[in-house]
Amino acid sequence: MTAPLLEVSGLTKRFRMDRTIGDTLRRKPHPAVHALNGVDLSVRRGETLGIVGESGSGKSTLARCIVRLIEADEGTLRYDGVDIRTLAGSDRRAFNRRVQMVFQDPRGSLNPRMTVRQTLAEALTVHRMRLKAGIPDRIAELMELVRLPREAADRYPHEFSGGQRQRIGIARALSVEPECLIADELVSALDVSVQAQVVNLLLELQQRLGLTILFVAHDLRLVRHLSHRVAVMYLGSIVETAETEALFAAPQHPYTQALLAAAPDLDPTRRHRVPAAKGELPSPVNLPSGCTFHPRCPHAFDRCRREAPLPRPTATGTAACHLLDQAAPAAVPNRQEIPAHGL
């Protein structure tokens, strides 16, 4: 078995909060938001790993820690066997070229005063991807790659639709010829029909360019159609990881079961008959003891309140739950594209 391209081990991130006047006078320590709590994760070369979970589960923080837009407090991040948390200078720039991120809001990541041509030329120049004479041809290639007309390169971001701006963000990421693409809520702000077009474009680009993709989303339909494997996050921890179709067919963790049961489905015969998670997401400032899901879990018992479960093998992958038994892994069918007319 080949080594993973990206390996995350024990990744922890806390965001310190301001103290109240009373806490300051009492010299109490600063409270902190526990965004990531010892995350372990691996991504194989050429695969798409979907990251799902409720808002506040730590998905986007994990993505930003991987590309070092946010520095983790503890843990290791290895890319192609190298600890990327130690990289600096030219080594850091080389990593930035190999791993690119596409953001949820393209308007916030594109300079409104620069045309698409200037944006793409800047990336090509900074990373020395082409000689000056070859930049126009490369820009034309990139526009064609994301299915935008060549003449659109001389327009500004505000002249495009949301889906087109997201394609420009993808083109900018691809301009430096990365190996790994991290898509953070790539299409969550787009209409459903446009979502299908962008997701199918991503599938096509992966097959054409051999990309490894980390796909962060809360929309389970998108994750199912795009991902080879899925990791489920809850309050800063990975609670279950499995091959995509195996996870959707037989979720092992109670949180995964509740997450799938909450997803809308027009076919009544396919609706999950699983108890829903109780209450609201607990505060990440004061995490529950033991298993962090136990206050909402319909199956919780005393051990869940006392002891945090470790990931264990299941019939479909791994999951962190005291209820689980050991079973043989299940066979997983292939992915399919989303129909262009919708999801």
Report residues per predicted region:
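Short catalytic/signature loops enriched in Gly
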Residues: 3-4, 17-27, 32, 243-343
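Conserved ABC transporter NBD signature motif
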Residues: 75-83, 95
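A short, proline-enriched helix->beta-strand linker immediately N-terminal to the Walker B motif
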Residues: 175-179
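P-loop NTP-binding/switch modules centered on Walker-like glycine-rich loops
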Residues: 182, 186-272
